[in-house]
Amino acid sequence: MRVVLQRVSRARVLVDGQVVGEVSGEGLVAFVGVTPGDGAGEVALLARKIAELRVLRDERSVLDAGAGVLVVSQFTLYADTRKGRRPTWSAAAPRPVAEPVVDALVEALRERGVVVATGVFGADMAVELTNDGPVTILLEA
């Protein structure tokens, strides 16, 4: 499981021009990629990291700050570009496998007290964000 975490001063995701998820003020955007072998162990580890990582201003976590996390599924995090000019995504989990894992991550974050907004799994989304810092961190489990 792979998460690209970005510290933001604002973020939102739109589907068909409609806002479906938003973080107002400081927070994090978590772009999440899943492989077929990912499960409860990876979800628990990454939920803890996302919730407790002290990457907001003044060395605070989203829990410390009461900040939100916008979770966006992104299978392209597992692009394989080693051959040719067109990436393949064979390492990414198919939707029936990946969607419940992303849902479990969202639920695990909420159980930790994190305010979570989401995109729509599998939708063509427009993600608008203002990266703060910039701070971008790759988490893997």
Swiss-Prot record:
E.C. no: 3.1.1.96
Subcellular location: Cytoplasm
Any one GO cellular component localisation term in the record: cytoplasm
Superkingdom per UniProt: Bacteria
Coiled-coil intervals, chain numbering: none
BP terms from Gene Ontology: D-amino acid catabolic process
Catalytic activity: glycyl-tRNA(Ala) + H2O = tRNA(Ala) + glycine + H(+); a D-aminoacyl-tRNA + H2O = a tRNA + a D-alpha-amino acid + H(+)
Keywords: Cytoplasm, Hydrolase, RNA-binding, tRNA-binding
Family of the protein in this entry: Belongs to the DTD family.
Function in brief: An aminoacyl-tRNA editing enzyme that deacylates mischarged D-aminoacyl-tRNAs. Also deacylates mischarged glycyl-tRNA(Ala), protecting cells against glycine mischarging by AlaRS. Acts via tRNA-based rather than protein-based catalysis; rejects L-amino acids rather than detecting D-amino acids in the active site. By recycling D-aminoacyl-tRNA to D-amino acids and free tRNA molecules, this enzyme counteracts the toxicity associated with the formation of D-aminoacyl-tRNA entities in vivo and helps enforce protein L-homochirality.
Subunit comment: Homodimer.
Protein name as it appears in the record: D-aminoacyl-tRNA deacylase
